[in-house]
Amino acid sequence: MEVLREKVEEEEEAEREEAAERAEWARMEKMMRPVEVRKEENTLKQETLRDLEKKLSEIQITVSAELPAFTKDTIDISKLPVSYKTNTPKEEHLLQVADNFSCQYSHLCPDRVPLFLHPLNECEVPKFVSTTLRPTLMPYPELYNWDSCAQFVSDFLTMVPLPDPLKPPSHLYSSTTVLKYQKGNCFDFSTLLCSMLIGSGYDAYCVNGYGSLDLCHMDLTREVCPLTVKPKETIKKEEKVLPKKYTIKPPRDLCSRFEQEQEVKKQQEIRAQEKKRLREEEERLMEAEKAKPDALHGLRVHSWVLVLSGKREVPENFFIDPFTGHSYSTQDEHFLGIESLWNHKNYWINMQDCWNCCKDLIFDLGDPVRWEYMLLGTDKSQLSLTEEDDSGINDEDDVENLGKEDEDKSFDMPHSWVEQIEISPEAFETRCPNGKKVIQYKRAKLEKWAPYLNSNGLVSRLTTYEDLQCTNILEIKEWYQNREDMLELKHINKTTDLKTDYFKPGHPQALRVHSYKSMQPEMDRVIEFYETARVDGLMKREETPRTMTEYYQGRPDFLSYRHASFGPRVKKLTLSSAESNPRPIVKITERFFRNPAKPAEEDVAERVFLVAEERIQLRYHCREDHITASKREFLRRTEVDSKGNKIIMTPDMCISFEVEPMEHTKKLLYQYEAMMHLKREEKLSRHQVWESELEVLEILKLREEEEAAHTLTISIYDTKRNEKSKEYREAMERMMHEEHLRQVETQLDYLAPFLAQLPPGEKLTRWQAVRLKDECLSDFKQRLINKANLIQARFEKETQELQKKQQWYQENQVTLTPEDEDLYLSYCSQAMFRIRILEQRLNRHKELAPLKYLALEEKLYKDPRLGELQKIFA
């Protein structure tokens, strides 16, 4: 390194000397030129300067919107506790140990960067990084697992880049300050997340290392959004069906084998060209998506969290990026190296080579060869000594001395100087800063909102794009919470214009999924229901302009399928709706599950009502030991015979095929009863189809009303948002206050001021009792009069001010602006309200004053201290 530095300095010195010589030759040549040439050059230079000034004046500088700065100057440290502003003796000792450790490390590893040991906190006090961690278990069950903790930290805080991307920060703030201002760099993110994970029981560590450009800048534009990744579909292996011995042989293939081979070759060429085109297109897209080379690759400082296996049933080690909350394998290429890591008990330096990023690192912190620790007494067990190393420790005295030496060198980590980390329920519910956060992914944009921030209950929206520039929208997914209509997800496909609504259980119509392109009736739509919440067991209803298909489950009549075909609607002269003028039914097909209580030859599997053709077709279930099923068809005839009588039933009106014919099925009476039963069933089926059409209309009308209202539900335990609970609580508080005033009034002693004028303990005479009574009543009467006069004075004052304002308005009415008129009208309205209230108070006071006077007089007569009055009126 020293040789390379000297070589670079020599080259720079040679370049400076060469530049000085060129400047000297140019000056000499200029002096030797004629005066005219020099004048022309000066003129040209002036014109060039004027042209340059003109062009520069046309340039407008636009200040780019930078990320909000988060520095110590923006933090209010006046209310911080003493532990933030000073160090305890134990912390000072720890800082000395850390400085000594850093000096030894710099001496032994001069090529390594300085250690990140004790940065300054928000009060400019150096604090050891391990004491900045405050293990805390949050009181929210959602924050008990690592994934929810990481997602909360990612959503709650706003990322601020490091001041110098090549160095760790000079300040490391406490987690309480970071939570208060909701901003921080990667080290602040990691400190907060690691504190929460350790409190939840994970073996977590803060890492000081190097990351990729995307990782350090929280750039997810080359990452696929996790919400767009579809789960892998399990491919079921098709079981090979063994050919039966007596199967029918297929007919002989008479097609030309040569033509088939040529067609196969042609198809293979087409597929090869298509595959080549797709490969070229994929390479082009990969080239476009490829990140530009980073000049600082491998040098950018980043901090993240390492979670080791063992605790909380973690099967293997993994990294957590605190910016995004995503987990990564320790082999991931985004993490380029590790300098050191720490938890709340110790500090470790990585002594392994990171030439292959973090792929070859072994995270055995008990191995002092790979991980150099700072403090003894760590909870990580040391490697066991081999037999060769153990041979030198044979004597008991040596073992005792070794134990004493370790005991003397051990040093316990001081307690954290950070206050208890607390997250209020309001902050936990709001999550994102100001309640909103936007994350840009590769071909996708994710927006998040706090619950109840949007009036329609929208909490998240995922927009998927077709191109990398995010201009052509493919689909939109919107997630909702606390909706009264139980709407949970809305999926909009911009390519097909198909909208799909997903509902949670509890909708009035038991909706589960509603797919549609238009809310107009008799259009293509699919409605799925929670069949257990419906009486009829309807699972799904598919509708087109000419058909309606319904699927059932769990019905007592074993109905599983109903398909209705409609004909063109008959035009009417008057205006008609779908309800008053239903579509004519052409055909109804119904299918049934097997009813084990009936024999197969009597259990109908499918029945078809051909309404227009006046035919009914039946197909029965097939017995297990048969390969064919019985069938029957009924013809409804409206003709009359030769005598003019209506034909009820003839043998040709029932065409049947029976696997095992029976005598009673051939009788006309049996066939007649079966046809009459089917006619009733047809009428019932047509009515049910009509009811289904009406139900669709009701659902569409209800959905339009719900979308227009988008009412949100509020829990009865949410006292801040629940208006009914709030009104009830305020009413109870008002009643308690009034009751308190009544108690104070009843306990008020009216005679106390007058009795104080007499000698204590002296018994009142008759004359003194009468005088006290008269004085008390006179004083009370005067107070009632004063109160009436006060109300009257306020009333007159308000009236005079209103009259003056009205007079001013009459004088300046022409020159007033609309804003002045609005202010005048508002003042008049408020003044009239005050005048009316004062008038009501005065009238009420006039009505109640005599009653209060009489009540006090009666109370004085009954007062035991004025017993002489009772003798007078006895």
Swiss-Prot record:
Residues 1-67, 257-297 form a coiled coil. Expressed in the testis. Disulfide bonds: none annotated. Its main location: other. GO terms for biological process: flagellated sperm motility; sperm axoneme assembly; spermatogenesis. Keywords: Cell projection, Cilium, Coiled coil, Cytoplasm, Cytoskeleton, Differentiation, Flagellum, Spermatogenesis. GO terms for cellular component: cytoplasm; cytoskeleton; motile cilium. The keyword Coiled coil applies. Residues 401-410 have a biased composition (Basic and acidic residues). Residues 386-400 have a biased composition (Acidic residues). Residues 1-20, 386-410 are annotated as: Disordered. It is found in: Cell projection, Cilium, Flagellum; Cytoplasm, Cytoskeleton, Cilium axoneme; Cytoplasm, Cytoskeleton, Flagellum axoneme. InterPro entries: CEPT76/DRC7_peptidase-like_dom (IPR056290), DRC7/lobo (IPR033551), DRC7_C (IPR056292), MORN_DRC7 (IPR056291), Papain-like_cys_pep_sf (IPR038765). Belongs to the DRC7 family. Component of the nexin-dynein regulatory complex (N-DRC) a key regulator of ciliary/flagellar motility which maintains the alignment and integrity of the distal axoneme and regulates microtubule sliding in motile axonemes. Involved in the regulation of flagellar motility. Essential for male fertility, sperm head morphogenesis and sperm flagellum formation. Component of the nexin-dynein regulatory complex (N-DRC). Interacts with TCTE1/DRC5. Interacts with DRC3 and GAS8/DRC4. This is Dynein regulatory complex subunit 7. It comes from Pan troglodytes (Chimpanzee).
